[in-house]
């Protein structure tokens, strides 16, 4: 009985360490993105304005790059490649560059409210996802598929620029990524148990990337909602 308790404690400590590593990587990614956005807005505002005036199609092309980077990064992470970590940081930096242009369209109040709300929701949903006894696999897979529908809707709205559709997309986006935050946290435990605690750094980077994307997208959808409520819209 005592031996079983020791094994359970060791497994629990290992899982906690795995979660800590993932959260640290995810937090580092968010910090890098925030820092790059701040640098862009603080020191390159004139350059950003010139780029904005070059046309919105330019940004449509730019937003395709992160999609390619995510696929490549996940592949490297699963292979436990040493390049996975620097590419993850580079990806976060590039996202910070892109997000900085979005932030220009909103007030500091909108940005702060969106970030604080996203952080609070992320914390609550992470706790729920980690400790709930309910199996969230079906929900997670359904929302994972729904993300592609969301991307298509956003692409179409890029041309129609409908405020009503923007609100609908943003509300649906918040719901989808709320579910994914809970699911991805539960999946961390599943991955750890499936590998009998022998999880590589690649797994940590892969899971950190998922949580990073969940948080960033939650923040951006909330920002659109707060912006529209405050009289700003992109």
UniProtKB/Swiss-Prot annotation:
Its main location: membrane. Disulfide bonds: none annotated. It is a multi-pass membrane protein. The gene is yrjE. GO terms for cellular component: plasma membrane. InterPro entries: Bax_inhibitor_1-related. It is found in: Cell membrane. Belongs to the BI1 family. The chain crosses the membrane at residues 25-45, 57-77, 85-105, 108-128, 142-162, 163-183, 203-223. The keyword Transmembrane helix applies. It comes from the Bacteria. Keywords: Cell membrane, Membrane, Transmembrane, Transmembrane helix. The keyword Transmembrane applies. This is Uncharacterized protein YrjE. It holds the Pfam family Bax1-I.
